[in-house]
C-alpha cells in the first residue's frame, strides 16, 4: 500500500515534469533563462487509499514554472515555483475547499533512482496510511514550511522531516 502511494505520487510528479520539459521556453513569460511553464492537468483524482474516499481536484490557478538542472554527480534537480491553487471536492458528501499549493519546491532525482523532495511554502502532502502513521502526519494535507522527504529507488520513504505546520488535514476537512 505504501509503495503504491509513493509510486502514484512519483508518477504524477515525473509526468508533470516530463510535460514541462516539452513545453516551449517562450511560454516561461519572462521568468528567466531555463524556466519553463509547468502545465498541470485541468482535473485530477486523489485515490481513496489516502483518505478512505475519492477526492476530485480542479486546478483553479496554474501559473507554475520549472527549471531542470544537472548536477556534477549526474543527478537531476528540478526547481519549481509560481502560483498554483486547487479546488478539492468529496463527491460523496459535496464538501469542497480550495488550497494554495504554490510551493516552491525542489526535487532531486539521483543516478541510483532515489529521490529527495524539499518543499517550502504551501504544498500538498500525500502519504499512504502506513507512512502517515509512521511519521505522525495526515494521509492528505496542506502544510507550510520546510518538508524534506527521501524516497528509495523502490518507492520506500526512507525519511521525512518537517520544520513547519500542517495547515489543513484534507481528509478530515472533506469527510
Regions found by a protein language model. Name each.
Residues 8-20:
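Bacterial N-terminal signal peptides
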Amino acid at each position: 500500500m505504501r509503495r503504491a502511494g509513493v509510486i502514484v505520487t512519483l508518477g504524477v510528479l515525473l509526468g508533470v515534469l516530463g510535460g514541462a520539459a516539452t513545453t516551449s521556453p517562450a511560454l516561461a513569460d519572462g521568468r528567466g533563462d531555463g524556466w519553463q511553464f509547468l502545465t498541470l492537468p485541468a482535473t485530477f483524482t486523489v485515490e481513496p487509499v489516502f483518505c478512505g474516499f475519492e477526492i476530485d481536484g480542479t486546478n483553479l490557478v496554474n501559473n507554475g514554472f520549472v527549471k531542470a538542472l544537472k548536477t556534477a554527480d549526474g543527478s537531476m534537480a528540478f526547481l519549481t515555483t509560481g502560483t498554483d491553487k486547487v479546488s478539492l471536492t468529496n463527491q460523496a458528501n459535496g464538501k469542497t475547499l480550495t488550497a494554495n499549493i504554490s510551493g516552491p519546491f525542489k526535487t532531486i532525482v539521483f543516478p541510483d533512482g532515489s529521490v529527495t523532495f524539499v518543499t517550502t511554502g504551501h504544498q500538498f502532502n500525500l502519504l499512504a496510511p502506513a507512512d502517515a502513521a509512521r511519521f505522525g502526519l495526515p494521509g492528505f494535507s496542506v502544510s507550510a514550511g520546510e518538508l524534506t522527504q527521501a524516497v528509495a529507488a523502490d518507492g520506500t520513504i526512507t525519511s521525512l522531516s518537517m520544520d513547519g505546520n500542517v495547515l489543513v488535514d484534507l481528509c478530515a476537512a472533506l469527510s
